[in-house]
C-alpha cells in the first residue's frame, strides 16, 4: 500500500505552530548542487500498520498525517520547499525493514515517521541508523528502544512504558490498590507487552504489591474465556492489562459477559479500544498520552479541526503522528535544512521546546531521545452517564502534577542503558 501526500511550497512562518530555541548554526555559502537540492521537494516516509490487530490505530495515524500536511500546505510549506510523504503499510518487522530500506535507498527520503509495533520500530531504527536518517517513533512504547536498543537517529514522540506505569501507578496508589494488594496481569506476547510487564512488576515490587497471576496472551487471541475463568478463581484486587490493539476491545466485551466485577485497569491503552468496546463494556482507569477531552485551547481547536475533516474525534495515535510531523517540520525550519546531524543536535539541545497542546511544553531527553510530556489518566464513565459514543470517560489533570518535573515519569526505567554509537 503506497500513498503520496504533498505539502505546499512557500514560506512557513518560523514561529508557526511550534515554539523553539536553540537554532542550529548553518553555513552561509553552499555549492550550486546543494542549492538546487535545497530548492527541491523534501521527501519523508511514513510507516505504520494498516492491517492486523494494530491496523485500526494505523488508520488514525494516516488521517493525522494527511491533516498535518494539508495544514502546513495552507500555511505555506517549510522554508519555501514542498514536502512529499511516501506512506506504506509496515505489516510486520521484516516488511517494515524492507520498506524502510527502499524508502531510504531508492526514494531518498530524508526521514521516516510512524510505527506502532515495537518489534517493527526496532527494525526500522536499524535501517535508519545505517542510512543516517531521522526516525521519529510515534506509537512504539518499548523501554528497550530507549535503553539497550536505542539509536542516535531514533527519537520517540510516543511515551515509553515506564512513563505510563509511573503515571497510572500513582493513581492506583491513591486508590489503595497497590500496597498489600493482589494483582492478576495479562500481557500481550510481544516486545511491547514484555517491556510493559517488566515495568509493572518493578512498580508493584517497589510499592509492596503481590503478583498472583501472570499470563502471556498471543497477539492474535480472540477468546479469553479460559483466562477469565482463572481470574474468577484467583479473586484478585486488581486485573491489570498489558494488552494492545483489538485485544483490549475483545477482553472488555468478554469481561462484561462473564459478569466479573474486580477492579480493572492497565498500563498500555489507546482510546480507540474504549470506543470500540462501547460504554456498556468499557471499564477501569487507564493512561493516555493525550485524548480528545484534554481541556486546553489548542487541544480543543485540534479536535474541532479533526472532527470537521473526518466526522469523529482524533484518537491518541492521531495526536502522536500529527505532533511528529509538526516536530519534524519545526526542526527542518529552524535548522534551515534536512541534514540529520544538525537535526539531532537541534533535538538534543535543552533549549529546544515543543508546544504539545498541553499545559507544559515538551522536550527530548538527550540521553534516551524520549520526548518528555504530560500524560493523563482516563476513567470509564458509568454507562447511564454517557451522552454519546465518544465521551465515555472522564480525565485526570496532567500528570505529573505541576510541582513535579517531567523527568519523574522516567524514574526507575527498565530496558537497559542507552549508549549511542559514536
Model-derived features: where do they sit?
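Extracytosolic ligand-binding ectodomains
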Residues: 2-7, 12-22, 29-31, 37-422
Amino acid at each position: 500500500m503506497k500513498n503520496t501526500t504533498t505539502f505546499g511550497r512557500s514560506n512557513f512562518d518560523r514561529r508557526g505552530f511550534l515554539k523553539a530555541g536553540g537554532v542550529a548554526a548553518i553555513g552561509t555559502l553552499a555549492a550550486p548542487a546543494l542549492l538546487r537540492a535545497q530548492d527541491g521537494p523534501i521527501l519523508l516516509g511514513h510507516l505504520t500498520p494498516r492491517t492486523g490487530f494494530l491496523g485500526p490505530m494505523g488508520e488514525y495515524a494516516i488521517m493525522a498525517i494527511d491533516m498535518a500536511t494539508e495544514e502546513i500546505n495552507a500555511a505555506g510549506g517549510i522554508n519555501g520547499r514542498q514536502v512529499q510523504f511516501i506512506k506504506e503499510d509496515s505489516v510486520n518487522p521484516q516488511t517494515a525493514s524492507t520498506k524502510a530500506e527502499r524508502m531510504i535507498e531508492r526514494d531518498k527520503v530524508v526521514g521516516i515517521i510512524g510505527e506502532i509495533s515495537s518489534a517493527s520500530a526496532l527494525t526500522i531504527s536499524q535501517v535508519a541508523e545505517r542510512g543516517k536518517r531521522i526516525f521519529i517513533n510515534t506509537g512504539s512504547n518499548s523501554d528497550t528502544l530507549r535503553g539497550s536498543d536505542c539509536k542516535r537517529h531514533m527519537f520517540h514522540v510516543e511515551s515509553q512504558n515506564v512513563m505510563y506505569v509511573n503515571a497510572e501507578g500513582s493513581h492506583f496508589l491513591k486508590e489503595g490498590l497497590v500496597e498489600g494488594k493482589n494483582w492478576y496481569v495479562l500481557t500481550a506476547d510481544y516486545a511491547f507487552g514484555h517491556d510493559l510487564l517488566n515495568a509493572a512488576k518493578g512498580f508493584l515490587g517497589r510499592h509492596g504489591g503481590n503478583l498472583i497471576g501472570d499470563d502471556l496472551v498471543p497477539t492474535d487471541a480472540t477468546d479469553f474465556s479460559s483466562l477469565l475463568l482463572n481470574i474468577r478463581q484467583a479473586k484478585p484486587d486488581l486485573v491489570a492489562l498489558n494488552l494492545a490493539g483489538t485485544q483490549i476491545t475483545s477482553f472488555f466485551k468478554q469481561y462484561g459477559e462473564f459478569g466479573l466485577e474486580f477492579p480493572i485497569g492497565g498500563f498500555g491503552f489507546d482510546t480507540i479500544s474504549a470506543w470500540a468496546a462501547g460504554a456498556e463494556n468499557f471499564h477501569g482507569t487507564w493512561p493516555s498520552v493525550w485524548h480528545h477531552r484534554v481541556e486546553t485551547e489548542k487541544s480543543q481547536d485540534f479536535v474541532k479541526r479533526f472532527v470537521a475533516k473526518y466526522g469523529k474525534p482524533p484518537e491518541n495515535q492521531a495526536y502522536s503522528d500529527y505532533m511528529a510531523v509538526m516536530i519534524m517540520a519545526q526542526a527542518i525550519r529552524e535548522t534551515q535544512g534536512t541534514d540529520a546531524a544538525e537535526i539531532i543536535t537541534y533535538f538534543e539541545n535543552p533549549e529546544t521546546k515543543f508546544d504539545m497542546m498541553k499545559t507544559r511544553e515538551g522536550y527530548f531527553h538527550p540521553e534516551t531521545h524520549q520526548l518528555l510530556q504530560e500524560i493523563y489518566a482516563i476513567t470509564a464513565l458509568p454507562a447511564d452517564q454517557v451522552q454519546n459514543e465518544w465521551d465515555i470517560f472522564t480525565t485526570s489533570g496532567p500528570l505529573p502534577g505541576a510541582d513535579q518535573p517531567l523527568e519523574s515519569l522516567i524514574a526507575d526505567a527498565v530496558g537497559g542503558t542507552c549508549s549511542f554509537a559514536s
